[in-house]
Every structure is written in structure tokens, then in C-alpha cells.
From Swiss-Prot:
Organism, scientific name: Arabidopsis thaliana (Mouse-ear cress)
Full protein name: Protein kinase PINOID 2
Residues in AGC-kinase C-terminal domain copies: 466-525
GO molecular function terms noted in the UniProt entry: ATP binding; kinase activity; protein serine kinase activity; protein serine/threonine kinase activity
Active site (catalytic residues): D214
InterPro entries the UniProt entry points to: AGC-kinase_C (IPR000961), Kinase-like_dom_sf (IPR011009), Prot_kinase_dom (IPR000719), Ser/Thr_kinase_AS (IPR008271)
Phenotype reported upon loss of the gene: No visible phenotype under normal growth conditions.
Gene: PID2
Taxonomic path: Eukaryota, Viridiplantae, Streptophyta, Embryophyta, Tracheophyta
Length: 525
């Protein structure tokens, strides 16, 4: 049972703040070892045929970026063999389980483009038996071309180190942004924006046959334009996936169909199987508009029954009743059209992919991962529910005094919500919708979890996302834009500043043209 308490209060302060730092994390530090390497381009750099094909291919979403153009110019100058000697490292941005990430620039480049360079000590991760994870991340990054996924600009090796040059996100991660809100949580409107873009990114990954398995605010980064980018794919795995066309008649079948009735078939021999990646086309249909019927808001409390579905039970605290348009193909709210209602669309969900790996952050682990009975793409929808909960309420729902108690809570504890104060009927309704979505995502039985059969298309249709124009989601102004903050702070400065970066890390022309020097210790910051 999910308990909920929402109260009205006038003049409650907003949660949002435009102050944010570029890095904050709950992770432990990772220390790299020393290495020696020749400064020559031919000896320090190594690119496999797969790397050349994957990382140098045309990526339409990045073709006009300054960082992409600068990297293309570098490849032309050095004969495509990009190596460590071509970059100047400025500072460490953070560290993870298999590597550290550094801010860097191309030496001698006229552009002020910044990159994030992930450095993996292959010997260290081999000892920890995690080398396969590093290789899988490299392979997956080479496949991606999406506005909300990272771009892999270059990949090379030096000594026993592996280097991945990726997009730099100056806004930091959502965990850091959340901590800088007055109440350490986001408003519903901000949560809806970040959750919608994250959902589109997960949809793309699933259409590519990639199960992410590591969604959390620390892994959702903020680009300079305020839009999101997923990061850290070392826990992901790949499998075959075949997109299917979902008609209006199929959408009402919901979770009543059995596994044998599912029209999609996937296959994956191992968690890290290598298959030909799918180049998906995410459908953005433009149906004729129709008016949605007005909602009548009453008081109710949301409860979750034993079967894992949600019921609305009358109460004096929180409730709602809805009048729905039975055949509407789109819903209009505040000038924004929700085109996911009853329209034919393409979906691809790797529901038959299976892994028994115990991976992830404890507070975000799905019950099926903890039980060790095998898990598939439904784990991403569980973590998505935890992600929503933390964004709105400032904490995760099952956190215990230690990791062991946290795991027990995930398996056995009921879902509950803290008391929340709202100021208006609109906020009241939004909070009820948010809690209802979280309840349907945090169903312990993965087969009954929202999204387990038809993926993101089920989640997009939920009332929480009503009014979101999925086809034009990149046109919506984000709650916070690092680029605008930079322009304000550097007003009157003649320098061209493209990224949110402290002035002490900006390279002068002399520094950019300094001769390359290999340090005895890579981790010299």
C-alpha cells in the first residue's frame, strides 16, 4: 500500500534555484597508476577498425557543434590518429567505479571547445574483473547518436590506459542541481521536464537494444543549453530488438496479455552479446487535434493493491476523479499537444533480454536484481520510478540504515510518500499524478510494472506527462540554462566563453600551443 499525504498551504516558497556547481557526487574516489608513453602520434594512439568506423561516422545530431568541428579538423591534421598528445588536461571532473573523468581541450585549436576525457586503467579494472564493462561502454558509446545521449569523439590507448573523449556537460549532474534547491528537491514542473527528456533517452536506448541499468541523478548531466545527457554506460548490456507498430486496438490490451501473446520477440544469448545495432526511427506522428474533456478534481488517496496495480479510494486527504475522452488521439494543454494518447506508434522493448548480474546502486536496485532470478529491460522502469521519487521528494523511498537494510526494504517494505504541501489545485493534481506514476513504476513484480510490455509508450500516456509535446521536446526551455548564466557572468568580457567554466581553467593562446609533455604520473591533479 502506498500512503500519501498532500496538504494545501498559501505562499509556499518555490523549490527552484539557478545556482549550481559543475560537480557533486556520492561516489568513491578512484586512483590511477603511473604510466610511461612515447609522445609520438603513431605510438601513443591505437584505434581498431571498429573504432574508426564507429567514432568517425557522421552523427547528424552533432554535425554543427563546435566540438565536433574541432575534432574533425584535428583528425584531418594528424591523419585520423588522435592521441593523448593532442589534448591538454585542465582538471579532474569526477571518478567512478572503473575510471576517472577529466576536463580537456585540444592543443592549438582556435576554438574554445571543451571535452570530457574518461581514463580507464585496464590493469586495475582487469584485477577487479571489470574490463568487460569498460569494453562494453566503449562499444555502446560508439553506437549512440541522440540529443540526450553522449557523443564519443575519439577513443585511443596509451600504455595500459584506455581513453574515451566525450561531450562535456558544464551544468554538472542532477544530483548536484537538486542539492542546490532551497528544499533539496525539484518542483513538479522541473521534474516533469527532466523526467520527460530522460524517458526519451531511455526509449532510444531500448530501441537500440540497450538496457541501461544505472539510471540515477548522478548519471543525468546538464548540457550548456540546459537539456540532459545520460552518462556512464559501463553497467549496460545489449541484445537484439525488433521495433513493432502499435495500433489503436493494441493499446487497450495493457498488462492483461500473457507472455505467449506478446507480439515482440527478442533474443540475447548473454548479457553482453554483440549484435548489429538497430538504427531506430522514433515516431513523431502529428495527428489531428482534439479537445480533452475537463477534469473534475475531488479528494482521494492512492493505494496500491496486492496485485501491483493502483486504485483510487475516497478520503478526506487526497483524491481525484477523471472524465476521459475515449477516442481522442491527442490532448491539448496550455498550447502543448500530447501526441501519445491513442495514436499508432512504433515501440521496441527488449523484454526477453535477461541478465543475472548484480549491478547498480543499492538504493536503485530493482527487486528482481536483488533476488538474482534474472532481469531484463523492466529494471530501467524501476530505476526510473526511484529517479522520479528522489527528484520530487529529495530522497529515495527504500533507503535503510545500511546497504543490507536497504535491500531488505526494496524486497519487502511497502511504498510510502512523505507529507507534501502544495499551493494550488493545479499543484495538487500534479502531485497526485506524480505519485500515481511512481506507484505504477515501483511495482515489485516486473511483469506488472508499467513499461514492462510496451516500454516508454505506456509511460508517456500517463496523466503526469499530459501536455508534453514529445516531438518538440527539445524546443522547450529548460528550468536552468548554464549557457545563460555564463553570458550574464561574463558580460562586458571580450572573450568568447562557450561553457560554464571558472576563468582559471580557460587556456590562453600560449598554453594551447605549449609542447606536449608526458607526466610520470597521469593522475597529477
Amino acid at each position: 500500500m502506498a500512503n500519501s499525504s498532500i496538504f494545501y498551504k498559501d505562499n509556499e516558497s518555490d523549490y527552484e534555484s539557478s545556482t549550481v556547481g559543475p560537480d557533486s557526487s556520492r561516489r568513491t574516489s578512484w586512483l590511477s597508476s603511473s604510466f610511461t608513453a612515447s609522445p609520438s602520434c603513431s605510438s601513443i594512439s591505437h584505434l581498431s577498425n571498429h573504432g574508426l568506423n564507429s567514432y568517425n561516422q557522421s552523427k547528424p545530431h552533432k554535425a554543427n557543434q563546435v566540438a565536433w568541428e574541432a575534432m574533425a579538423r584535428l583528425r584531418r591534421c594528424c591523419g585520423r590518429a588522435v592521441g593523448l598528445e593532442h589534448f591538454r588536461l585542465l582538471k579532474r571532473l569526477g571518478s567512478g567505479d572503473i575510471g576517472s573523468v577529466y576536463l580537456c581541450q585540444i592543443r592549438g585549436s582556435p576554438e574554445t571547445a571543451f571535452y570530457a576525457m574518461k581514463v580507464v586503467d585496464k590493469e586495475a579494472v582487469a584485477v577487479k574483473k571489470k574490463l568487460g564493462r569498460a569494453e562494453m561502454e566503449k562499444k555502446i558509446l560508439g553506437m549512440l547518436d541522440h540529443p540526450f545521449c553522449p557523443t564519443l569523439y575519439a577513443a585511443f590507448e596509451a600504455s595500459h590506459y584506455s581513453f574515451l573523449v566525450m561531450e562535456y556537460c558544464p551544468g554538472g549532474d542532477l544530483y548536484a542541481v537538486r542539492l542546490r534547491q532551497p528544499s533539496k528537491r525539484f518542483t513538479i514542473s522541473s521534474t516533469r521536464f527532466y523526467a520527460a527528456e530522460t524517458l526519451v533517452a531511455l526509449e532510444y536506448l531500448h530501441m537500440m537494444g540497450i538496457v541501461y541499468r544505472d539510471l540515477k541523478p548522478e548519471n543525468v548531466l546538464i548540457r550548456e543549453d540546459g537539456h540532459v545527457m545520460l552518462s556512464d554506460f559501463d553497467l549496460s548490456f545489449k541484445c537484439d530488438v525488433v521495433p513493432q507498430f502499435l495500433s489503436d486496438n493494441d493499446r487497450d490490451r495493457g498488462h492483461q496479455e500473457d507472455d505467449d501473446d506478446i507480439s515482440i520477440r527478442r533474443k540475447c544469448s548473454t548479457p553482453s552479446c554483440t549484435t548489429t545495432p538497430l538504427n531506430p526511427v522514433i515516431s513523431c506522428f502529428s495527428p489531428t487535434s482534439s479537445r480533452r474533456r475537463k477534469k473534475n478534481v475531488v479528494t482521494t488517496t492512492i493505494h496500491e493493491n496486492a496485485a501491483g496495480t493502483s486504485d483510487s479510494v475516497k478520503s478526506n486527504d487526497v483524491s481525484r476523479t477523471f472524465s476521459r475522452s475515449p477516442s481522442s488521439c491527442s490532448r491539448v494543454s496550455n498550447g502543448l499537444r500530447d501526441i501519445s494518447g491513442g495514436c499508432p506508434s512504433i515501440f521496441a522493448e527488449p523484454i526477453n533480454a535477461r541478465s543475472k548480474s548484480f549491478v547498480g546502486t543499492h538504493e536503485y536496485l530493482a527487486p528482481e536484481v536483488i533476488s538474482g532470478q534474472g532481469h531484463g529491460s523492466a529494471v530501467d522502469w524501476w530505476t526510473y520510478g526511484i529517479f522520479l521519487y528522489e527528484m520530487i521528494f529529495g530522497r529515495t523511498p527504500f533507503k535503510g540504515d545500511n546497504n543490507e537494510k536497504t535491500l531488505v526494504n526494496i524486497l519487502k517494505a511497502p511504498l510510502t510518500f512523505p507529507k507534501v504541501i502544495v499551493n494550488s489545485p493545479k499543484e495538487y493534481e500534479d502531485m497526485v499524478n506524480a505519485q500515481d506514476l511512481i506507484i505504477k513504476l515501483l511495482v515489485k513484480n516486473p511483469k506488472k510494472r508499467l513499461g514492462s510490455l510496451k516500454g516508454s509508450i505506456e509511460i508517456k500516456r500517463h496523466e503526469f506527462f499530459e501536455g508534453v509535446n514529445w516531438a518538440l521536446i527539445r524546443s522547450i526551455k529548460p528550468p536552468w540554462v548554464p549557457k545563460e548564466e555564463t553570458s550574464h557572468k561574463t558580460k562586458g568580457d571580450n572573450r568568447s566563453v562557450n561553457y560554464y567554466l571558472p576563468p582559471r581553467f580557460m587556456m590562453s593562446r600560449k598554453e594551447r600551443n605549449e609542447p606536449y609533455h608526458v607526466s610520470n604520473y597521469f593522475d597529477y591533479f
